[in-house]
Amino acid sequence: MPIEIPKDKWPGSINTLIIGGTEAEGGTRTSSVTIGGQTTMPYLHFEAPTPNKPVIGIEIKSRKPEDWSPLLTDVWGEAMADPAQWAKKAEEAGADLIVLALTVEDSPEDAVNVVKSVLGAT
């Protein structure tokens, strides 16, 4: 006897968001990422279609974190000392998105330089 999976219909939907603008759209990116649009809860793809695939985002920091687990520092290695190199390594690891976390210790000039270097590396 087959097992019937209970299904529910949700009245709302998750807003769709496009992150990143290509040059044709006035941005600096080579591609954009579209998220959202689901009309069901996460991982319940049998209830309704998932219009946009899940994406992976990796957070990098403007400064090397001193309080991270050795497991993470071993994986990222020396790339953690340079946000641009770290972003490139995150991209090579398969990240669809890179979250750049700036700190209050960054001066406005340093923050601008870090953002520009990460944009140039990705």
Mark where each language-model region is.
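Conserved, mostly hydrophobic/aromatic
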Residues: A90
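Basic, amphipathic N-terminal segments that precede the first structured/catalytic domain
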Residues: M1-T34
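A broad, low-specificity signal for short, low-complexity segments enriched in glycine/proline
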Residues: N15-G20, I58-S62, L119
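Glycine-rich, aromatic-flanked loop segments that form ligand/cofactor-binding clefts
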Residues: E25-R63
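Well-ordered, non-membrane alpha-helical segments in soluble/globular domains
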Residues: W76-A87, D110-A121
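Short, well-ordered coil/turn segments that N-cap beta-strands
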Residues: N52-I56, G94-D96, T122
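Glycine-rich, proline-tolerant flexible connector loops at the mouths of alpha/beta enzymes
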Residues: D67-L71, A95-G120
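Active-site mouth loops of central-metabolism enzymes
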Residues: E4, D8-W10, V55-Q85
